[in-house]
Amino acid sequence: MQSYSRLMQFKVKDLMIDKRRLVEVPDNATLGDALNTMVANRVRAVPVAAKPGQWLGAGGSMIVELDKQSGSARKQYIGMVTMLDVVAHIAGDDGESGLDKKMAAPVSSIIGHCPEGLSLWSLNPNTSIMDCMEMLSKGIHRVLVPLDSNTENITGPELVESASAYAMLSQMDLISFFFDQSSQLHGILSHTVTDLSAIHNTVLALTSQARVKDAIQCMSIAMLNAVPIVEASGEGEDHKQLVDGKNRRVVGTFSASDLKGCHLATLRSWLPLNALEFVEKIPRTLLFTAATSTPGRELVTCHVTSTLAQVIHMVTTKRVHRVWVVDQNGGLQGLVSLTDIIAVVRSALLSGAPDLF
């Protein structure tokens, strides 16, 4: 319990040290512009900034950036655009000209296409790590943190905020914090993902015969950021649909973030490709090499006997947002996501069970 008490002393501002300047796009930027910005800055999402007072922010939010000298409102963040928004927007059978038209759409028109974009949250820098964990364990992947909040006495999530500067806090930042504090969390992290109930046992998958355009369509409908690719059964299954991946051998991962490796012209020519071919080609493009620190397309997997410490090491070093759980033959058993990791660590800390400290 002593290590738990030390952990409780950390606040969100302790996670914001050395965070870089916020990467954003204006509301009149095209979807193509937003994609280029995400590629150039190696991020999976960008907030959308507009002139203050002209938009209702996502989820009724009012998150405003102030001029540091005058205190007047300079811009309002009206929502967030993610790689999954890109996938959802370009999904469909509209042909090449349709793709061009879709990528020319203003980003303001696609905010809220995916559940994450339905709200925009800020988190006060004085918020405790435990409260931060609660928020990020409920499907919220990232929040804005004011660097000089005008609401110093308020902690927790807010839909209304004003500050002269913001930074982004993501689930990965919190997982990296767990990694850095592994000595304090040893009692929890040394348990297996099975013991901690961190595994999602049902996983939808693409078959190895699915095409890129079908993969995009499936992910858009299911609102999934990534899906495993499993060996096709050869039994006449529909490769245009997601299948139950249980016990099938995993051969790859198709992720919305893979699109960061594509120029528009490249994406256009690759849409008819087999999805597995696509994920194998992506690492060899110069654009993808520049946009990721992960060499090649290594399949990141764990076992039911893997410890949470091992899984956290995988996600932080490989920079992946989920780990497929497989058996000794590579058969898919489930997955562990960043949301799952945060939820089980928080639950274990709150339980105060003696064997977890």
UniProtKB/Swiss-Prot annotation:
Disruption phenotype: No visible phenotype; probably due to a complementation by PV42b. Shorter siliques and reduced seed sets in pv42a and pv42b RNAi double mutant. GO terms for biological process: embryo sac development; stamen development. Residues 16-97, 113-185, 198-273, 293-351 form the CBS domain. SMART domains: CBS (SM00116). Keywords: CBS domain, Repeat. Expressed highly in rosette leaves, cauline leaves, open flowers, developing siliques and dry seeds, but at a low level in stems and floral buds. The keyword Nucleotide-binding does not apply. Belongs to the 5'-AMP-activated protein kinase gamma subunit family. Plays redundant role with PV42a in regulating male gametogenesis and pollen tube guidance. This is SNF1-related protein kinase regulatory subunit gamma-like PV42b. It comes from Arabidopsis thaliana (Mouse-ear cress).
